[in-house]
Design a protein with these regions (language model features):
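Retroelement reverse transcriptase polymerase core
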Residues: 1-178
């Protein structure tokens, strides 16, 4: 497969913008009257600030985020991976505490494995950046704002770390699955 992608790489594009075909949108329903998260930006090294700036530019270019005018937002957390690169995360713990829980069922791994007994053929797909294929409900986009030294931004697609993201993604998989 890698050979095919390498040979015909010009036909494989990196998706940009908000997926227009996706009927499943991620809502962010908040507890009425709850205060929105509004922490102070963390002090960081020059290297970390450069990485945050690079990642924000990449996400803006892809159309996954946009500038926000909301006066509050969650904070960025950088986590260094084993290979020395950085994982860009948003600390949504405060937002998640005031988000109404979605109880869409997520199957147990052992139940899924039981369904495979006796089967002869298996396939595997890589849902690269799968969450980024799910748009945020347009009326809820402002709720997932985050702060950076460069300004305030909000996700147009579902980021990792939000309460109910696994349930939204499972619903999408159920809709496209068998």
């Amino acid at each position: 497969m890698d050979k095919v992608v390498e040979e015909y790489g010009d036909i494989f594009t990196s998706p940009t913008g908000v997926p227009l075909h996706c009927q499943n949108k991620h809502p962010i329903d908040l507890t009425l009257g709850a205060p929105l998260p509004n922490g102070s930006i963390y002090r960081r090294s020059v290297l970390e600030n450069d990485e945050i700036k690079r990642k924000i530019q990449e996400l803006l270019h892809k159309g996954h985020i946009r500038p926000s005018s909301l006066p509050c937002g969650s904070l960025i957390v950088l986590v260094q991976k084993k290979d020395g690169t950085w994982r860009f995360c948003i600390d949504y713990r405060a937002l998640n505490k005031i988000t109404v829980q979605n109880r869409y069922p997520i199957p147990r791994i052992d139940d899924l494995l039981d369904q495979l007994k006796g089967e002869k053929y298996f396939s595997k797909i890589d849902l690269k950046s799968g969450y980024h294929q799910v748009p945020i409900e347009p009326s809820d986009v402002w709720k997932n704002a985050f702060k950076a030294k460069e300004g305030l931004f909000e996700w147009l697609v579902m980021p990792f770390g939000l309460t109910n993201s696994p349930e939204t993604f499972m619903r999408l998989m159920d809709d496209v699955g068998p």
